[in-house]
Swiss-Prot record:
Substrates-to-products reaction catalysed: phosphoenolpyruvate + UDP-N-acetyl-alpha-D-glucosamine = UDP-N-acetyl-3-O-(1-carboxyvinyl)-alpha-D-glucosamine + phosphate
Gene label: murA2
Subcellular location: Cytoplasm
Catalytic EC class: transferase
GO cellular component, one term: cytoplasm
Function per UniProt: Cell wall formation. Adds enolpyruvyl to UDP-N-acetylglucosamine.
Protein name as it appears in the record: UDP-N-acetylglucosamine 1-carboxyvinyltransferase 2
Record EC number: 2.5.1.7
Binding-site positions, UDP-N-acetyl-alpha-D-glucosamine: 95, 124-128, 308, 330
Pfam families for this protein: EPSP_synthase (PF00275)
One annotated GO biological process: regulation of cell shape
Chain positions with 2-(S-cysteinyl)pyruvic acid O-phosphothioketal modification: 119
């Protein structure tokens, strides 16, 4: 069993580079299935277990995938006749596998995709995906753990209003509509930077997607799409995690690949706490010189405060004086890390969807386990400032979303190592 061991107390200084965005590369990889001509080459691809999983899913669909971790690139050739079935063996490992359904429906007119797996955070329903496909003209039914989708006369453009701005549903419907007949208007959509990256990629392939980054996206279907080269945007969640690593240790760190426009709600909250941020071209320098002030956090869909930064921000709030409240509105059951923080002497109580933090916690090193991807990072952040040694286990979660986080922190001066227990 792998374990990360941290001896707390070191101030972090220096420069660090953010890897490519996990939440951008997965939909872009599945969108490569839309290209019936040419080969796609994706650059700045992070070396993550989730990337390997989606590559395996794409390979089972009869696309040729080549993954060069040293070059941080993936090439996808989807010009052959695709298979319709995404099997349970891979899809069960990761929810994002459902994102092959839109491209398969668009290319083949039918798809058979196992119900997905992934992080155990709340219900994360896929009803919005199914609603979108049905409104584009697909017949959907579920049987034996699979979702079956088909369309006799091809997908037809229409107006679709999402009940809530689901990121995955927005991506899946954009991909399906990109080869549909006519115009699709997609309302109340997700506005994340990863949506913009996907739209840019499809447009580079010859598609016609406009409005990404706003709450209404318009897709004019085209007959074919072709492979292209595309660089994945930096990971704003990793960037935020590294900014907090600098802040929590009261350090001085330059985070290359941190783009302010991708993380406005986070940086505003950090500044509200008294963290000094210096904005440069695609980089942010973080410094802390004074006592941090208490702030309240409420997670919301983008551009609100990201749920994927909630647990890391909670770690930082533990080191500030005063009364703080963290409210989680996006996912249910996303306070599982609180029990682990308490093992480290954190003063937190949970009531429903809110966690209350009283005063500054004198964190103590302890053995803790990661309950999900972002909790893993948050526990490591807490370990950076805890008195004594912190051991974080269940690193399979961490490896789904961070490339060499311990190595990057060690290069900044942390006393941290990864071992096999």
């Amino acid at each position: 069993m792998d374990m990360i061991e941290i001896n707390g107390g070191n101030r972090l200084t220096g420069e660090v580079k953010v890897s490519g965005a996990k939440n951008a590369v997965l939909p872009v990889l599945t969108a490569s299935l839309l290209a019936s001509e040419g080969v796609s080459k994706l650059m700045n691809v992070p070396a993550l277990s989730d990337v390997e999983t989606i590559n395996n899913v794409i390979s089972t669909l009869n696309a040729e995938v080549s993954y060069d971790k040293d070059e941080e690139s993936v090439t996808v050739d989807a010009t052959k006749e695709l298979n319709e079935e995404a099997p349970y063996e891979y899809v069960s490992k990761m929810r994002a596998s459902i994102l092959v359904m839109g491209p398969l429906l668009a290319r083949l007119g039918h798809a058979k995709v196992a119900l997905p797996g992934g992080c155990a955070i709340g219900s994360r329903p896929i009803e919005q995906h199914i609603k979108g496909f049905e409104e584009l003209g697909a017949d959907i039914h579920m049987d034996g753990g699979f979702i079956y989708a088909s369309t006799e006369n091809g997908l037809k453009g229409t107006t679709i209003h999402l009940d809530f701005p689901s990121v995955g549903a927005t991506q899946n419907i954009i991909m399906a509509a990109s080869l549909a007949e006519g115009k699709t208007v997609l309302e109340n959509v997700a506005r994340e930077p990863e949506i913009v990256d996907l739209a840019n990629y499809i447009n580079e392939m010859g598609g016609n997607v406009s409005g990404a980054g706003t709450d209404t996206i318009i897709i004019h279907g085209v007959e074919t799409l072709h492979g292209v080269e595309h660089a994945i945007i930096p990971d704003r969640i990793e960037a935020g995690t590294l900014l907090i690593a600098g802040a929590i240790t009261r350090g001085d760190v330059l985070v290359n690949g941190a783009i302010k426009e991708h993380m406005t709600s986070l940086v505003y909250k950090l500044e509200e706490m008294g963290v000094n941020l210096d904005y440069q071209d695609d980089a942010i320098r973080v410094r802390v010189e004074d006592e941090l002030k208490p702030v309240d956090i409420k997670t919301l869909p983008h551009p609100g405060f990201p749920t994927d930064m909630q647990s890391q921000m909670m770690a930082l709030l533990l080191t500030a004086e005063g009364h703080k409240v963290v409210t989680e509105t996006v996912f249910e059951n996303r306070f599982m890390h609180v029990a682990e923080f308490k093992r480290m002497n954190a003063k937190i109580s949970v009531e429903g969807r809110s966690a209350k933090i009283e005063g500054k916690s004198e964190l103590q090193g302890a053995q803790v386990k990661a309950t999900d991807l972002r909790a893993a990072a948050a526990l490591i952040l807490a370990g950076l400032v805890a008195d004594g040694t912190t051991q974080v286990t269940e690193l399979k979660h961490l490896d789904r979303g961070y490339v060499d986080l311990h190595g990057k922190l060690e290069a900044l001066g942390a006393d941290i190592k990864r071992t096999q227990a």
